[in-house]
C-alpha cells in the first residue's frame, strides 16, 4: 500500500488542466499554457509536444533524431524521458499512456512507454516501469511466447535493465499484461520504501520489493525508448 504524502507536501500541490488532461503539480508554475506540456521539459534526448491520440488531447514524447540514431548504433535503455520537475520519493504516480511505432527504430521496437522515478539531479540515473505495448495480450494477432509474458518491465539505470534481470531472475521483473498498441491504458505505480506495486487499468501486474534507489527524492519522467512515440495524459502525483 502506498504511503500517505506529508501534509506540507500536499499544500504544495495544485491542479492544471490541458483539455481533458489533468495534472497535479506545484502551485506557482506558469499557467500561460496550462497542462502537462507546460510542466514537462524536453531534454537533449527527447522532445515533447502537444498532441491528440484516439480522440483525446495529450502530449507526445519521442526520441530526437540524433538520439534515435545513437540508439540504433549502440542500443537503448538510456535516460530517455521528458522531465516533470515534481519532487517524488514515495507515494503514487498515475498516468494514462499509449504508444505507436514510428518506423524509425530497430525491428525489436515494441512500443516502449512508461514512467521513470527516483531520478538523480543530473537526470542520468533512475528507476522505471514501462510497458511493451506490442507484447500485450490485447494485440491481434497475439504475440508469441515468450514475448506475451514480457509486457511490463521494471528497470534501474544504469546496470539493471531487462537483459540483466532476465538472465539473473527470469520472470521476476517482467510480466504479461492486458495491453495493446494504440490503446490508452492507466498506469499506476505505488512506491513505499523499497517496494513498488504496478497496476494497469486497475489490475496489479508487477510487484518489486528491492528498489535500487529507494528513498531518493527527485523528479519523475515520461519515459519512452527506441522507435516509439509515447502519449501521456491525466498525470497525477500524490
List each language-model region with its residue ranges.
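N-terminal secretory signal peptides
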Residues: 1-8, 18-22
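Hydrophobic alpha-helical targeting segments used for export or membrane insertion
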Residues: 12-13
